[in-house]
């Protein structure tokens, strides 16, 4: 039986590399999104802690001079939260874009892999039928040779 050789092997290797790169990019985007979500949770916790501290201070003594910096700190934290929310939205959009890119690369690889499998099975069937024909020819020639000798 002749060995099977896939002529599109370089394309298959390129598509495997493209899939790996797309998967790595997608994974990095997921990690970046998760880090931003952790940062957002931390900022929200800081805001809650600051608001609790301010309410404790107000229960003891309310002084407008101490309240102004507290309000500025709250506004600053809220701006950071809004900025982080915006960054998360961008990261999620990028993550979705990279997910689609990965799926495209995966589908391209799968199509070439299916083609390779199809060609390989066709090759095996062809080689098997050739071998069977060759065996039949050998058997028939022996039979004819033996028939002619008798």
Model-derived features: positions:
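Charge-rich amphipathic alpha-helical interaction elements
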Residues: 1-150
């Amino acid at each position: 039986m002749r060995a099977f050789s896939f002529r599109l092997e370089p394309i298959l290797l390129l598509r495997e590399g493209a899939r790996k790169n797309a998967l790595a990019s997608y994974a990095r985007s997921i990690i970046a999104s998760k880090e931003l979500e952790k940062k957002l949770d931390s900022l929200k916790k800081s805001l809650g802690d600051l608001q609790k501290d301010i309410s404790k201070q107000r229960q003891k003594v309310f002084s407008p001079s101490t309240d102004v910096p507290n309000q500025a700190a709250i506004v600053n934290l809220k701006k950071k939260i809004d900025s982080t929310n915006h960054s998360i939205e961008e990261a999620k959009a990028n993550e979705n874009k990279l997910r689609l890119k990965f799926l495209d690369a995966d589908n391209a690889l799968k199509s070439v892999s299916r083609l390779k499998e199809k060609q390989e099975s066709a090759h095996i069937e062809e080689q098997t039928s050739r071998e069977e024909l060759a065996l039949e020819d050998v058997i028939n020639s022996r039979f004819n040779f033996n028939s002619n000798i008798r």
